[in-house]
């Protein structure tokens, strides 16, 4: 039996190195995002998107492949019922996502596209998707008029950029601009 691919490390908030989660929260403030459903790829130990968006009344589904990040989520929601009601983080490999388990989203973050792909991820034996297939899945799960956001300073942007460029040509999306360090697309 194959084990699930997961990350053996964790990510604390280092805004000077990777400000994407903080900039996302700023973007939602600027866009007045309220009462929306958000999918967030890569929670970090800080859970700043889940916490702030939950407090604003948005619903957040977050995924982490880090045991430590998930354990901190459990501690967080155990101590904060309001956050627990509006923020659901799960531990898993995003490349194994089953679309039948997901609702539709108004906003999707793809800040870590191409960062966690293992050599066996898309193999028939493991059953995972490629980064492009995963991006297509979340595009399908994004409502018309919804947003997909990327982080061009990602450690894997050299690979993700090509995936995004091809995706932009083939999917019903349009680039609407940049916000601080984020690249923003809207689904038509």
Where are these regions (language model features)?
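A short SAM/SAH-binding and catalytic strip from SAM-dependent methyltransferases
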Residues: 106-128
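Conserved SAM-binding strand-loop segment of SAM-dependent methyltransferases
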Residues: 83-94
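Conserved class I S-adenosyl-L-methionine
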Residues: 33-46
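Conserved SAM-binding motif I beta-strand of class I
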Residues: 59-65
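A short glycine-rich, Lys/Arg-flanked "PGG" loop and its adjoining helix->strand segment in the class I
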Residues: 123-144
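Class I SAM-dependent methyltransferase Rossmann-like catalytic core
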Residues: 1-32
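A short acidic, Gly/Pro-enriched loop at the edge of an enzyme's catalytic core
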Residues: 95-108
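Conserved SAM-binding loop of SAM-dependent methyltransferases across substrates and taxa
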Residues: 45-58
